[in-house]
């Protein structure tokens, strides 16, 4: 009797462990295969694996997670520019440029919010269009700086722009996979 219970316990534990390993492997496989369609594989895998929703997400869910990362980036950049830079600047031209840049990042966040709605509606063409718009708004900010003689594009804004561009690139790659 005792040996039957031990055998049953061992079979149950073995089955449970193999199920957990299989589920983890399947999650890793879906993230990795999804990220292979992007231009930023390592970044994509790292970002998705760090989100607790990823293990249960399908490809569309992974796209939504990355869009959320982009919305956070764009919103925090808009707030950073508006709060940290604009508030301390006395130069009216620079202040106006920073306000314009803050608005562009807010528009990028709005475009990404629309992308979430497009994903829910499975309107992937519109989702792609909104992601491209979100990716382009920071370029407008950089161009505003270029047009004003003597203004240097701040390093932190440049870094955040590159980050948003990378995030949007990942989302675009995932959207391409959804269209296939």
Swiss-Prot record:
Localization of this protein: Vacuole
Transmembrane segments: none
Source species: Arabidopsis thaliana (Mouse-ear cress)
The keyword Disulfide bond appears for this protein: yes
Keywords: Disulfide bond, Glycoprotein, Signal, Vacuole
NCBIfam families: PME_inhib
Protein name per the record: Cell wall / vacuolar inhibitor of fructosidase 2
SMART domains listed in its UniProt record: PMEI
Main subcellular localisation: other
Residues glycosylated per entry: 26, 73, 84
Signal peptide: 1-23
